[in-house]
């Protein structure tokens, strides 16, 4: 007769939730209660009924998958009353071919009771609100860049090569010329009056670039795109004001993070918005690197370790760290820039930049945890480190050949 395999129970009473946009399927089980599965809607009143049902049955722990934003309304209602364990859906997949809402909630409850679930990081409310602001600002900033690129295409369609003679067509000189093209009769000679003396290109070359064929359609498109850019930049300014208000209590952490080469003020706020200011939620620096997806995955078979891609993690913090790593790689006479140059020869640009991003994350972890500024090692650190290791290696080899061999210590 086949024996039934059960997990050892480590939690007294728990609940597994299968969360969707419109429904929540809940399964409770544990000591002194009968396993039961119920379905609730995601409206607030129904979620309150779910909360009351769980409290009535003495539930202490609740597990649910981090499915998009659908878990947030549930967390808002249950968060103050139960220990919520938010889990990655990839980590709790059931047996293929056996998937229903009821079975999923029962499987989550079973794993929860056995203590087999790894909880995802849920920042405090203030950090979650700051994260919303920073992510929205990032999206709007990209939208502005997209609109500016579209504007350049309209100019190109009108045979105006303004981007070939100005580094930034949205500078003071460029905007004066653009406004005149939109609002006045198009005349290349008159446009030259707006050219500032600091522009490197000659006036004859500039005139050649701005001589084109402008139609009413081009004027309409340019005006509409400019209005879109201005409106979006106004919204970004409002968000910046709100971010400044939200980050007042994190002033010290932001100031210290700015000491990392390539990070800057916006980068420091971005890091705080994703990881928070309490590093006790991460047992050590390896855990935060794993959570962010900034460390290699494990790929070992038959005792051999094979190369593997970086692990899955927080896509937003990963993108931010890569962006900051590019900035750090362009700094002068810094450890991070020399590290990038050292790695890029054997790894290639993409892997090298992820490695530098990993360094920035680890530095950020200790800076926030210990409230200390970044310790700049300098561009010579790596070469000196390799030199010292090489000297130590040759000393060891020589002493193996001649145990009584002594070395003189050179005094600088």
Indicate residue ranges for each PLM-predicted region.
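A detector of single, family-specific signature residues
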Residues: 1-412
């Amino acid at each position: 007769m086949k024996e039934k395999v059960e997990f050892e129970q480590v939690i007294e009473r728990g609940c597994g939730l299968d969360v969707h946009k419109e429904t929540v399927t809940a399964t409770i089980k544990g000591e002194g209660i009968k396993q039961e599965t119920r379905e609730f809607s995601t409206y607030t009143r129904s979620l309150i009924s779910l909360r009351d049902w769980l409290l009535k049955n003495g539930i202490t722990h609740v597990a649910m998958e981090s499915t998009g934003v659908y878990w947030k309304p549930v967390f808002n209602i249950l968060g103050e009353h139960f220990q919520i364990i938010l889990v990655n859906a990839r980590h709790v997949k059931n047996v293929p071919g056996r998937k229903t809402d009821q079975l999923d909630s029962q499987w989550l409850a079973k794993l929860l009771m056995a203590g087999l679930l790894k909880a995802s990081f849920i920042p405090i409310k203030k950090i979650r609100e700051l994260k919303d602001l920073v992510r929205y600002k990032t999206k709007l900033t990209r939208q502005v860049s997209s609109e500016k690129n579209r504007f350049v295409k309209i100019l190109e369609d009108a045979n105006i090569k303004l981007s070939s003679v100005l580094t930034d067509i949205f500078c003071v000189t460029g905007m004066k010329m653009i406004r005149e093209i939109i609002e006045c009769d198009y005349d290349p000679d008159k446009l030259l009056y707006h050219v500032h003396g600091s522009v490197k290109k000659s006036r004859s070359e500039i005139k050649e670039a701005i001589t084109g064929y402008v139609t009413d359609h081009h004027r309409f498109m340019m005006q509409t795109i400019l209005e879109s850019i201005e409106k979006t930049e106004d919204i970004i300014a409002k968000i910046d004001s709100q971010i400044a208000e939200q980050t007042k209590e994190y002033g010290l952490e932001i100031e210290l993070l700015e000491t990392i080469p390539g990070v800057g003020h916006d980068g420091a706020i971005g890091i705080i918005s994703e990881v928070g200011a309490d590093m006790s939620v991460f047992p050590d620096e390896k855990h935060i690197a794993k959570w962010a997806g900034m460390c290699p995955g494990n790929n070992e078979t038959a005792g051999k370790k094979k190369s593997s891609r970086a692990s899955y993690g927080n896509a937003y913090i990963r993108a931010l760290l890569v962006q900051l790593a590019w900035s750090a790689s362009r700094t002068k006479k810094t450890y991070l820039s020399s590290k990038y140059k050292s790695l890029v020869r054997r790894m290639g640009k993409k892997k090298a930049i992820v490695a530098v991003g990993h360094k920035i994350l680890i530095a950020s972890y200790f800076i926030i945890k210990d409230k200390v500024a970044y310790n700049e090692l300098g561009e010579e650190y790596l070469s000196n480190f390799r030199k010292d290791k090489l000297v130590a290696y040759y000393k060891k080899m020589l002493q193996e050949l001649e145990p009584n061999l002594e070395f003189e210590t050179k005094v600088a």
